[in-house]
From Swiss-Prot:
Database matches in InterPro entries: Ribosomal_uS2, Ribosomal_uS2_bac/mit/plastid, Ribosomal_uS2_flav_dom_sf
The organism's place on the tree of life at top rank: Bacteria
Signal peptide span: none
Keyword check for Ribosomal protein: yes
Organism (species): Mycoplasmopsis agalactiae (strain NCTC 10123 / CIP 59.7 / PG2) (Mycoplasma agalactiae)
Protein known as: Small ribosomal subunit protein uS2
HAMAP family, A to Z: Ribosomal_uS2_B
GO terms for cellular component: cytosolic small ribosomal subunit
Any Pfam family hit: Ribosomal_S2
Family: Belongs to the universal ribosomal protein uS2 family.
Length: 317
């Protein structure tokens, strides 16, 4: 009788173990949510590169082997992988170091708005107009300009009392210019830990200053970019306002959520990832829209992807 009970008990245990393994196997097969859907990457036009004649050969591993109408296409699978990697790096770093400082940089027209918006919501510094040479390498010069701005602010508060109308207008014009260039960095007393840049080519001086001072640089890499120019790059279209907005917002989400805030785009449903319309956005140009439709149709049939990626790059220890 005891033997029979033992056999029953063993059989029950074995059955339970098998059930547990089945549950574990089922759980392991569940698809993890992606940081952003591929559909949104396509909607934002992140895959558009430049003409083949303008490419940087160092970007080869981030591009589809095929080109469309003489233009390189950026591998959206690599974009997704490296975007999520950058998100995790920033999120974990800020979680461990809450006082980490950032500077968002994007002086081209397509980047200005999202650079400023995401910097403000994360309490970061930003430059969305002109990068003043020496911003990171010659702080004393910047401090002097900030002091001049503060003096003019004091005079403006008194409506430039003691000055003629013409002199007052000249001073107000100077003050407006200083605000435009310095508002995003006026409180920066020390070097930021990270620079997040929309276009390393356009803002090459900023990137060079950052790397010379040990500031880690994360940037968008278009097909004409040099991946060696930054510490970590995310291959994507840097000429589309939608593409820049999508990438910058997700990177800002990494900072915001690490500090207890809410994400706007990262790991959100497509219905919440609402990309603004830009009249200057090339993805709205009919010529590019035809290329986009063609690409979407072909990608569904299995466009070859680039498997070789560099995910072991360390941005920060």
């Amino acid at each position: 009788m005891e033997n029979e009970n033992l056999k029953v008990e063993q059989a029950t245990t074995a059955e339970n173990n098998m059930a547990e393994k089945a549950d574990d196997s089922k759980a392991s097969k569940e698809v993890k949510p992606t940081i952003v859907s591929r559909e949104k990457l396509l909607e934002a036009g992140t895959y558009f590169g430049h003409k083949k004649s303008m490419w940087n050969p160092k970007m080869k591993e981030f591009l589809y082997p095929q080109s469309k109408r003489g233009m390189h296409m950026i591998n959206t699978n690599v974009t997704l992988q490296r975007l999520e990697f950058a998100y995790n790096i920033l999120n974990k770093f800020v979680a461990k170091n809450p006082r980490t400082t950032f500077i968002f940089v994007g002086t081209k027209k397509q980047a200005k708005d999202t650079i400023k918006d995401n910097a403000l919501r994360t309490g970061s510094f930003y430059v969305s107009e002109r990068w003043l040479g020496g911003t990171l390498t010659n702080a004393s010069t910047i401090f002097k300009r900030v002091k001049v701005m503060e003096e003019l602010e004091a005079q403006a508060a008194k409506k430039f009392q003691g000055y003629t109308k013409k002199e007052g207008l000249i001073k107000q014009k100077e003050l407006d210019k200083l605000h435009k260039n310095l508002d995003g960095i006026r409180k920066m007393q020390s070097l930021p830990s990270f620079m997040i840049v929309a276009d390393p080519n356009v803002d090459a001086i900023a990137v060079k200053e950052a790397r010379s001072k040990g500031v880690k640089v994360i940037g968008i890499l278009d097909s004409n970019s040099n991946p060696d120019a930054v510490d970590f790059g995310i291959p994507a279209n840097d000429d589309s306002a939608k593409s820049i907005t999508l990438i910058m917002t997700i990177l800002a989400d990494a900072i915001a959520t690490a500090r207890g805030g809410k994400a706007k785009f990262a790991y959100q449903g497509d219905d919440k990832v609402i990309l603004p319309e830009f009249k200057t956005d090339k993805t709205l140009n009919p010529r590019f829209m035809n290329q986009r439709r063609s690409f979407e149709q072909n990608s569904a049939e299995g466009v070859k992807t680039v498997e070789k990626t560099t995910t072991s790059t360390e941005v920060a220890e």
